[in-house]
Amino acid sequence: MEGCVAQSKWLAYCRLMRIDKPIGSLLLLWPTYWALWLAGGTAPGGKLLLVFTCGVFFMRAAGCVINDFADRHFDGHVKRTCQRPLPCGALSEREAKALFVLLVGLSFALVLTLNAMTIWLSVAALTLAWLYPFIKRFSHLPQVILGMAFGWSIPMAYAAVGESLPLSCWLLFAANICWTVAYDTQYAMVDRDDDLRIGIKSTAILFGRYDRLVIGLLQLATLLLLLWVGDLNQLQGAYYWGVLLAAVLFVYQQQLITRRARTSCFRAFMNNNYVGLILFLGILLAL
């Protein structure tokens, strides 16, 4: 019996960290890899690659924990989230806070192996990760904060590789914010009816019937900023093929969300993993 309880507790911790749903980690990983390769113009060293890869998974898990802690009184009223570990009682609030501290501690231990500039930037990363879950109580733009949080690994990567933050770094950061707001709005469209009922704010609610238009404009801005990054870094043809394929996927996503059906909006959101991967492969082949 004790073994079953321990196993259930372990599974609850895994679910709280979204180990069973790696899409969030991947959407955070691809921009990190874009920056690591672009910052040095070549493949990063093994140490940097290991530190940033592990850091992505630790901080994404920490972000999920603090998000669920912040939403613990709301998730039970939403169909998609009512079975999460905190609202269903599989884990206590104290256990969630302890896990958050552990994950942040592991992430900071990794950052301490890097230079001082990267360490200072990591403080902002933690602030953004903590701020995002609470912003949706007061603003319809939590997706913008999420975009900054998901993209903060970009200036950190540039700092770790070259101890500088050139224009291409901030253009890539801006592109990632536009992309993140676009795909997380698709994600928020899944929960829009529930969020309206319980008073949670999101860009999906803010944009209303113009949601598809705004998502399209954000996707266009993402592509234009990526083209600018390619020009500044004098990247070869493979990169631009990657941007073109990303544009094709954006068109496909627009088709998916036409009727705003929950399952189709979620499929559009999930499709963004391929966008990130294709762009990374384009960078890889262009350098």
UniProtKB/Swiss-Prot annotation:
Query: Keywords on this record?
Result: Cell inner membrane, Cell membrane, Magnesium, Membrane, Transferase, Transmembrane, Transmembrane helix, Ubiquinone biosynthesis
Q: Which protein are we looking at?
A: 4-hydroxybenzoate octaprenyltransferase
Pathway assignment reads:
Cofactor biosynthesis; ubiquinone biosynthesis
Q: Which PANTHER family match?
A: 4-HYDROXYBENZOATE POLYPRENYLTRANSFERASE, MITOCHONDRIAL, PRENYLTRANSFERASES
A GO molecular-function annotation: 4-hydroxybenzoate polyprenyltransferase activity
> What residue intervals traverse the membrane?
23-43, 46-66, 99-119, 141-161, 162-182, 213-233, 237-257, 266-286
In terms of Pfam families, this protein maps to: UbiA
Family label:
Belongs to the UbiA prenyltransferase family.
Q: Which NCBIfam families match?
A: ubiA_proteo (TIGR01474)
Which Gene Ontology CC terms are recorded?
plasma membrane
Task: For this entry, list what GO says about its biological process.
Answer: ubiquinone biosynthetic process
How this chain sits in the membrane, per its record, is: Multi-pass membrane protein
Instruction: Please give the CDD domains that the UniProt record associates with this protein.
Output: PT_UbiA_COQ2
Query: What compartments host this protein?
Result: Cell inner membrane
